[in-house]
Amino acid sequence: MSEKIYPVAKPVESHALINKAEYQEWYAESVADPEQFWGKHGKRIDWFKPYTSVKDTSFTGDVSIKWFEDGETNVSYNCIDRHLATNGDQVAIIWEGDDPSLDRKITYRELYEHVCRMANVLKKHGVKKGDRVTIYMPMVPEAAYAMLACARIGAIHSVVFGGFSPEALGGRIVDCQSTFVITCDEGLRGGKPVPLKANVDKAIDIAARGHVMVKNVLVIRRTGSPLSWAPGRDLWHHEEAATVSADCPPEPMKAEDPLFILYTSGSTGKPKGVLHTTGGYLVYASMTHEYVFDYQHGDIYWCTADVGWVTGHSYIVYGPLANCATTLMFEGIPTFPDAGRFWDVIDKHKVNIFYTAPTAIRSLMGAGDDFVKRSSRSSLRLLGSVGEPINPEAWEWYYHTVGDGRCPVVDTWWQTETGGIMITPLPGATDLKPGSATRPFFGIRPELVDAEGKLIEGAADGNLCIADSWPGQARSVYGDHERFIQTYFSTYEGKYFTGDGCRRDADGYYWITGRVDDVLNVSGHRLGTAEVESALVSHHLVSEAAVVGYPHNIKGQGIYCYVTLMAGSEGSEELRQQLVKHVRAEIGPIASPDKIQFAPGLPKTRSGKIMRRILRKIAEDDFGSLGDTSTLADPAVVDDLIANRQNRAEAA
């Protein structure tokens, strides 16, 4: 755990929306009287019919979560229409293509027309309020238009990441019984085409076997490559949009009407369709976007996520647009045409706020500083991290090398199920500790409990729960409320269980230690894999590390480490011994790695998450059935890991 503290710098504090005293005052009010606090802040969005009821929530029994229940609004109206009178000519979306020579700027007025036309196309083909629409798109502006068009007419969107296989897509179409799909002919990532329409065709066949018939596929032309076509079912968007009006009135929606379903992996392997609703979600997404990123009018804001993930929903589309921000959408990958792409884009578009994932930060750190140094990055004033705990070494590199030691880093902890950021620094209010998500956002009451469910006070390690509801919270698992209750509310009665382990330090700062199933039990001692990974990555030759447990006949669990080295470094027995010594020195003898496997890469999903399940199987010498590997970005990585596994002696 890093003991370093970076106090809020005076220039940051003087410019920021919230200072320390205000944070403390607002936070105290938000937990003492959530009704009053959210009653006030719920008004940050426009309501067609104002709410009189603010909070009606119960984490026990049948678990019911309702916010602003009698209010009526529309998300698309709040993200577009209400800005037109004063900011219609402001850029809403900057699109940066996969090819560095391609970009587009879309103003709020243009956004209005694009979204209304797409909404009218949906209506023309029979899509009604409450219908589910599946969106399977690359990072092009039309992905945002599709989401906003659904929200405009009250259809429920289910965005499926464009990297998912036809099987995964088909399963998600069946689960929410979607009969309308929006896609592209192809996507482009790192110069390589992604066969989206072909995948949709296969997924529709799979869905038909599950008795769900897709009626229409709306296709956006991206590359112009030839593709198979089903007349009557398949529709070209550019042809359809030309036949409809550029005005579409927003459907008044009740605050608790569903807005979207987003599938997230569950421990059972069957994805859960996390359900978010209209009013509370938008209040929370927009409020966290404004205060966590200290968003001020005129800032250029870039979140590098994909709209297929919750980060893309809340912090590329809904939060920023509700706040009349300029949001950047990036089609490409961080390493194409080379590992300086992020920094080039920051200079090109004068980005002020940059939000990315630790896995990207670590891989760019491994590529060396020259790619960063060739850019100026002088426009940057704030850096953010999302997706997993960031190890202190990557944090320090991000802060000093990317941000030149002048941009606060907001290390944000949250989940698909939370709708928005939960534990985070606020730039003008929170002293920073590298590796810590720091303090709760307004209205969030974190609690640590032990395995028996007893509340732990003060500095401690425990399971992270949230004691009370907040407006952005998911309401259910689509079509399976019982699973929602069992997954999140049955482990610790009356609390939302996050599934994450956490340490609270003496200053009341929170340190996420990783999923509770990523905790090792070594000779009776609890050890978070994130801690061991952090220790390994703090060695100057290590770019990335993943740690899993495997059965050990003396310790119960042994520690198996997969290590990717910095460019130009070679693995050797000598380096292996060095790393063991290094980890012992960082954490203690209990954390001594038993196996270290040098690997050219780690198995990751296309969103950058490490697939630890695969690493566990290989560590256990049980790679015959690796389960669903359809979401792997690079399957060849797995073959290399199996070929060079370190556990054959035990297995033999």
Swiss-Prot record:
Catalytic activity line of the entry: acetate + ATP + CoA = acetyl-CoA + AMP + diphosphate
Alphabetical GO biological process terms: acetyl-CoA biosynthetic process from acetate
Organism: Rhizobium rhizogenes
Residue ranges of coiled coil: none
Modified residues (N6-acetyllysine): 609
Residue positions binding Mg(2+): 537, 539, 542
Protein name: Acetyl-coenzyme A synthetase
Function recorded in the entry: Catalyzes the conversion of acetate into acetyl-CoA (AcCoA), an essential intermediate at the junction of anabolic and catabolic pathways. AcsA undergoes a two-step reaction. In the first half reaction, AcsA combines acetate with ATP to form acetyl-adenylate (AcAMP) intermediate. In the second half reaction, it can then transfer the acetyl group from AcAMP to the sulfhydryl group of CoA, forming the product AcCoA.
Name of the gene this protein is made from: acsA
GO MF terms, alphabetically ordered: acetate-CoA ligase activity; AMP binding; ATP binding; metal ion binding
EC supergroup of this enzyme: ligase
